[in-house]
Amino acid sequence: MSLEDSLRSLSLDYLNLLINGQAFSDVTFSVEGRLVHAHRCILAARSLFFRKFFCGGSDPSASSGLIDQTGIRVNPSGSPRSSNGVLVIPVNSVGYEVFLLLLQFLYSGQVSIVPQKHEARPNCGERGCWHTHCSSAVDLALDTLAAARYFGVEQLALLTQKQLASMVEKASIEDVMKVLLASRKQDMQQLWTTCSHLVAKSGLPPEVLAKHLPIEIVAKIEELRLKSSIARRSMMPHHHHHHHQHDLNAAADLEDQKIRRMRRALDSSDVELVKLMVMGEGLNLDEALALHYAVENCSREVVKALLELGAADVNYPAGPAGKTPLHIAAEMVSPDMVAVLLDHHADPNVRTVDNVTPLDILRTLTSDFLFKGAIPGLTHIEPNKLRLCLELVQSAALVLSREEGNANNNPPSSTTTTLPMYHHPMNDDHNSSSSSGNNHNIANLNLDSRLVYLNLGATVGSGQMSDDHGGRHGDPAMYHHSHHDY
């Protein structure tokens, strides 16, 4: 066993203590009316706050009290006890979800500071949201950061800062300003620099910023804008290039602002605003990578509405890799996205610069899943979704191949019947009405792919799939790539 495997095993063993609740527990916390069982020795070893808290007195009952907003410990008379006789410590400084994340990090040294994908959240109205950079995800990260600072867990604070720095690049400007305020309050210079530059580039006038930020922060943003403008002018080598360079910079800033406004509109499902930007401001959806962004970060309904505008090329290759939206959807293993793209004539045979098709991506993922038990780069995957994505793309490729064959075999004057791009039962109102179409598609699949489907289903269904840690099983949620190389 390697050192990495040994540490991972140790981490899981400690985490199991927390998961098993009352097993060997000698301290219980009450958070938002719910009991959380823990172990003093682990908390004291991992957090200076808890070490001081538990060493408050020689009498065990003296270490029980209220962890309130000010960090003051109080010993109320008649403190309640849990079922195992251990005194219960009320916690009012953080919420239940954040407290569990904090304990998870203290026990295992690792934690995912992201809400569950597609989970209904009180401050996120987007149905099917991935919660990668929405207001709910930002709020959870900010609450976790505050808790990490409060309980003196600096490693968790640093981890959360990195998470927030990644989130704000795609977050709405309102959420960026929330992070900006938190970074200033908690003296996080790097996060402050990132957020202040994003707010400065947003193009929002000072009077609008003043509604969300203290006046001294607005002044710093304006100072930053002024310095940025002076720096751009000082970089111009010759006077006669001044106006030309200034115009180029202004145009680049304007395009950047357009793209940010477009992304905020897509995040809030406001496709009508995007339509107005296309018609009134000349926004180029392909150059702005609107469809790529929507596939990766928005719901199926938003992607469908964006495609129906008719202003975006569904097969547009983006970035040095040349990935199309269908490549992105295949990497995400998202049947909804794959289906809506194929519905709007996405090409299943389109290739990247490296000569990779969406079908190649799904076949590789399936092969890795079958023969390795896990997919490199993905922490979790739902086999049924992988199988459905593969079926959709392979069926579309097969139909397209037949159409091309018919066109080559028939003279131009002959009349041929054009088959639909593919048939997808997810788009029908009643599954029963599409059973014949499904059977037709599945019958056309080649033997190799059919064996892949059977093996994938049999492996998962029989519970024979295992991993390096003794074959743990569960119903994993699909992992979503938060960044793509396009």
Curated annotation (Swiss-Prot):
It is found in: Nucleus; Cytoplasm; Cell membrane. It comes from the Eukaryota. Zn(2+) binds at residues 124, 129, 131, 134. Pfam families: Ank_2 (PF12796), BTB (PF00651), DUF3420 (PF11900). One of its GO terms (cellular component) is plasma membrane. ANK repeats lie at residues 257-286, 287-316, 321-350, 354-388. CDD domains: BTB_POZ_NPR_plant (cd18310). A zinc finger (C2HC NPR-type) spans 121-135. Residues 403-441, 464-486 are annotated as: Disordered. Its main location: nucleus. Residues 25-115 form the BTB domain. May act as a substrate-specific adapter of an E3 ubiquitin-protein ligase complex (CUL3-RBX1-BTB) which mediates the ubiquitination and subsequent proteasomal degradation of target proteins. Transcriptional co-regulator involved in the promotion of leaf and floral meristem fate and determinacy. Necessary for the development of stipules at the base of petioles. Required for the abscission of senescent organs, probably by regulating the cell wall disorganization in abscission zones (AZs, e.g. pulvini at the base of leaves). Promotes slightly root-cap border cells separation from the root tip. The BTB/POZ domain mediates the interaction with some component of ubiquitin ligase complexes. Homodimer. This is BTB/POZ domain and ankyrin repeat-containing protein NBCL. It comes from Lupinus angustifolius (Narrow-leaved blue lupine). The lineage of its organism: Eukaryota, Viridiplantae, Streptophyta, Embryophyta, Tracheophyta. The gene is NBCL.
